[in-house]
Amino acid sequence: IRDIDISLERGKILTLIGPNGGGKSTILRSIAGQLQKIGGTVFLDGRNTESIGRKQLAREMSVVLTERVRPELMTCADMAAAGRYPYTGRLGILSEEDRLRVRRALKIVNMESYADADFRTVSDGQQQRVLLARVICQEPELILLDEPTSYLDIKHKLAMLQILRRLVREQSVTVILSLHELELAQKVSDYVLCVKGEYADRYGTPEEIFKEEYIRRLYDLDNGYYSEIFGSVEIKRDAGKWGERSPAADVSAANDAGKPGTPEVFVIAGGGSGASVFRQLQREGIPFAAGVLHRNDIDYELARMLADCVVPERAYERIGEEAYAQALRIMRNCGRVICCLKDEEFGEMNDGNRRLLREAEKAGLNVERRT
């Protein structure tokens, strides 16, 4: 890894993202002093970290890496208490104040009931939470975490990130961590460093980094689509007999009936009502069209990634006759129509979709209501 030149102010979270093997762990280990640097300097509060004594550095910097810790004959409380040893004397004897801090830290990570349990017998996720308690006990200025959410379920992933944000907000702690979950990185980070190959590819705020085209390039994403609105990825539709398709397939992508890629189902949706149907049809490999969807509708964002064609309308405009006619033509070529809207969800702006539903019923098409 070369040409890394970044600075991070106190009380901020920097997240490293990038493909596997890109160098995220190498950067964290270099900052922590666990890898000898070929060149360059790491400064902490204006001081070269190599000039700071080990015990003082342990008070100011806490590190949790991905390797599993397998200590012998240590309870969860013992592991958390390890964070207090930079503050003890040569014999490492904990004071009552130290023990109080250990109990508080275990309570924060919801592991106080496991204080006396053998660390090796608790689950990987619970071990990760105990290691976070150790970090809290250590009271550092800088926390380094390598994939801290790897072994956690979604509830405890969120809990861990909330704890980190609280430490940042209340104690002005600085956090540098690596994450694979882009949707979490987008929400928790103040700054993001993108690492790929030998270089730090880009550095900036989440708003600057999490762009559809850039994330696709960073991860060489050719088997799915990244949505900057949702902050998540969608699985690319299998090519199969229907061939390849790129996102943003508006009405111009619709083919004539009977040709490969022709939608078999027309979905009338809006306001998020079509999401589960879009994903179900994609899982089943059924090509479908969606419309009429306003370009600021959340269903439009998903449909443009999963549907074979989308009939759009401008944001905040009533569905016009041109969009209605295009949708009607495509719908008539489909053997099946799914309407995801309740009767009361039709209004002035999307009255064209009510007309589409009536035309489908009048024409005797196979109409299914999903509400």
Task: Describe every region a protein language model picked out.
Residues 143-147:
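Catalytic Walker B motif of ABC-type/P-loop ATPase nucleotide-binding domains
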Residues 81, 96-114:
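Conserved ABC ATPase "signature" region
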Residues 40-48, 57:
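Conserved ABC transporter NBD signature motif
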Residues 48, 193, 197-208:
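Conserved switch/coupling elements of ABC/ABC-like ATPase nucleotide-binding domains
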Residues 32:
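Helix-to-loop junction immediately C-terminal to a conserved catalytic motif
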Residues 139:
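Conserved catalytic motifs of ABC-family nucleotide-binding domains
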Residues 220-318, 339, 347, 366-371:
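ABC ATPase nucleotide-binding domains
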